[in-house]
């Protein structure tokens, strides 16, 4: 009986000592109590995408990259990775429902969604559950700005404006630019402001700023104003249809200048429409350069061509989907846990010069990536990288 009392006393002393060493009860639990979910046989990663509906094709491109990375790296910490699919159908109500499903299925991290609105819908649900998420092609600043558990693998829209301004001043050596942007388009207005602010900061001047109505048929009056001002470079953050018309009509008014655009131009449809325009007429920012030069770029291209054919060309969303998966995998390994979301998110944001297929990736304090931007043009009826803008941070 006496021995039992002594043993019980020692147990109580151990527990009290342990609690006094822990700042909170949560820390005690995390340190000494094994979570049953840590013992599961697979590690679950959520794939939150529109896999049906009118946005299905875009969701499939991101999913293709995620699945390719999963084939290359099928395990984490010795356990098989299970991809858990959540079809948000690009619908707000459905998005909320399937985001909650991912929480119930105890995924460790979520990848997606295509469409910033879809990610914004899921964000508070994932934040409440402390489940980190990585957006793949969302360029809306709000995705990360007000959502501490969301990061992104692509750069924000405004940074494209910054990169193009640097290209115009530092590579083209043109210090007088014009901007031509669609009226009432918040996205275009934001990236135009970023371009203009950086251009002026670098010593340039915005000679002329003109709005136009998207969907119009004739832009010659606006283009003549740029010609009269002698503008040699014009930033046009517009869709493919409007941009192609503007570029062709510039020839009609004999406006000799270079048009700068965003990654929206990196589509086969745009290439077909402007292929005859020439190398010196078009330059745009891109989310991916096949010549990025990292070992992971080579790994990605080798796996992609093996699966889809040597001549297959990966879409940028597929490359970024691949990077989102391998970044998530790295964060889980670094955290050493699949259930402590706050620690996983902390380790995710600590990545510096991480080798992705799209280049070296670091994160700032809110989860936006710090990465190089490829500037491309049309050459021999193909998109070709002509310059890389390397950000200087710190």
Where are these regions (language model features)?
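Extracellular/periplasmic bilobed ligand-binding domains
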Residues: 126, 176, 191-286
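An alpha-beta-alpha
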Residues: 150-214, 232-233, 309
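Extracellular/periplasmic periplasmic-binding protein-like sensory domains
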Residues: 247-322, 333-335, 339, 377-379, ...
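Hydrophobic alpha-helical segments within soluble ligand-binding/sensing domains
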Residues: 95, 153-177, 189-191, 218-220, ...
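Solvent-exposed, acidic/polar segments of extracytosolic/periplasmic ligand-binding ectodomains
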Residues: 24-43, 349-394
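Periplasmic-binding protein-like
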Residues: 47, 102-114, 134-136, 178-182, ...
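Extracytoplasmic "Venus flytrap"
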Residues: 31-65, 73, 86-92, 114-117, ...
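Beta-alpha junction/loop-to-helix N-cap segments that form part of ligand/metal-binding clefts
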Residues: 24-34, 57-64, 72-144, 212-219, ...
